[in-house]
A protein has these predicted regions:
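Terminal and domain-boundary accessory regions
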Residues: 1-161
Length: 161
């Protein structure tokens, strides 16, 4: 089984919904459960100041392979940084040799990807995300879905103050 994590999707969902950070270690543990995982990939965006380097290093220590790309800044200041196509390509490649892929994102753009993998490879596609920010149609397309909002204490980092 493989786990593919859209860091930006999860990070911004947790921040917007709860003002908290995600405990990615607990997310990985819940995704894997009792199964043997072959690969866990976290997809992130590097900013100009490189503030996230320590975070990416921590993810690697937790068992993730971290793939990064630079934040694009367009004329006029518009910023763009997403991994949708990269995640889709990796998911299709991996689905040929895995029995389960867990997609950690609530982005409805992944619906065609989920349907394609299910219909062509027989690989199960499961999902994890915060229910309030997850596309309902994505949830329906997945073989199984874990709503991280149902166990916030486990999946969010609360300060000790």
């Amino acid at each position: 089984m493989g786990v593919l994590v859209d860091i930006q999707n999860l990070y911004y969902s947790a921040k917007a919904l709860y003002g908290k950070k995600v405990n990615f270690q607990k997310v990985l543990e819940a995704a894997v459960g009792e199964r043997v995982f072959i690969r866990a990939i976290a997809y992130g965006i590097k900013t100009v100041d490189g503030q996230e380097e320590k975070f990416f290093e921590a993810l690697e220590k937790q068992g993730f392979e971290v793939k990064t790309k630079d934040l694009q800044i367009f004329p006029g200041g518009v910023k763009k940084g997403d991994w949708d196509v990269g995640i889709a390509v990796d998911a299709i490649k991996l689905s040929k040799s895995l029995d389960v892929i867990v997609l950690v994102s609530g982005d409805g753009d992944y619906i065609p990807l989920v349907q394609y993998i299910q219909s062509t490879t027989g690989c199960r596609v499961e999902g994890m995300a915060f229910g309030e920010s997850t596309s309902a149609k994505l949830g329906e397309a997945l073989d199984d879905f874990i709503d991280l909002s149902e166990n916030k204490k486990k999946f969010l980092i609360y300060s000790r103050n």
